[in-house]
């Protein structure tokens, strides 16, 4: 009888494991999430696995043995409870396939109103308040200089969130 199981894949080989398992007629699910991150100084949307290195697989152990799955390229091992691989309920798989999170931002990416510290440039060491993105590679910060608030555009690589 077909059931869902959870595999742990070797680091960086989730895609490889999924491709090889699908060639063996194993149904695979690797839920993805889109994050807004600052990569090389630019705000970009990046798609990442919701559960890094974990892959949900559906197969019948009477047809395809677990050792065949375990020996597949990119697969490290089954997640187990005791001696046998853990069976994941179909309701959990259904929820994961239906769930589509929106507007998720990397925790290190500042939101408007967050305090930041400037790490480079003329204002190095100053604390500021992040107000808004200014294009892909820059952001607007609110600086308090001599009791006067000044808006200043700074490269995304020149500050970090506190």
From Swiss-Prot:
GO molecular function list: DNA binding; transcription antitermination factor activity, DNA binding
KO phenotype (gene knockout): Inactivation results in increased initial adhesion and biofilm formation.
Keywords for this protein: DNA-binding, Transcription, Transcription antitermination, Transcription regulation
GO biological process: transcription elongation-coupled chromatin remodeling
Top-level taxon of origin: Bacteria
Any single GO CC term annotated in Swiss-Prot or TrEMBL for this entry: cytosol
InterPro entries given in the database record: NGN-like_dom, NGN_dom_sf, NusG-like, Transcription_antiterm_RfaH
Reported function: Enhances distal genes transcription elongation in a specialized subset of operons that encode extracytoplasmic components. RfaH is recruited into a multi-component RNA polymerase complex by the ops element, which is a short conserved DNA sequence located downstream of the main promoter of these operons. Once bound, RfaH suppresses pausing and inhibits Rho-dependent and intrinsic termination at a subset of sites. Termination signals are bypassed, which allows complete synthesis of long RNA chains.
Assembly and binders: Interacts with both the nontemplate DNA and the RNA polymerase (RNAP).
Family: Belongs to the RfaH family.
HAMAP family assigned: RfaH
Protein name: Transcription antitermination protein RfaH
Species whose genome carries this gene: Escherichia coli O6:K15:H31 (strain 536 / UPEC)
Gene behind this protein: rfaH
């Amino acid at each position: 009888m077909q059931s869902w199981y959870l595999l742990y894949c070797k680091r960086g080989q989730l895609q490889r494991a999924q491709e090889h398992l699908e060639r063996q007629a194993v149904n695979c699910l690797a839920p993805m999430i889109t994050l807004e991150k600052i990569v090389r100084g630019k705000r970009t949307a990046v798609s990442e696995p919701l559960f890094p290195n974990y892959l949900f697989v559906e197969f019948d152990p009477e047809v395809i043995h677990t050792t065949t799955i375990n020996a597949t390229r990119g697969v490290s091992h089954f997640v187990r409870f005791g001696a046998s691989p853990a069976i994941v309920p179909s309701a959990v798989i259904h929820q994961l396939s239906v769930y589509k999170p929106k507007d998720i931002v990397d925790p290190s990416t500042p939101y408007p109103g967050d305090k930041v510290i400037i790490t480079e440039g003329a204002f190095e060491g100053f604390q500021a308040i992040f107000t808004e993105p200014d294009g892909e590679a820059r952001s607007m910060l609110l600086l308090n200089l001599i009791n006067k608030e000044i808006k200043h555009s700074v490269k995304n690589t020149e500050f970090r969130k506190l």
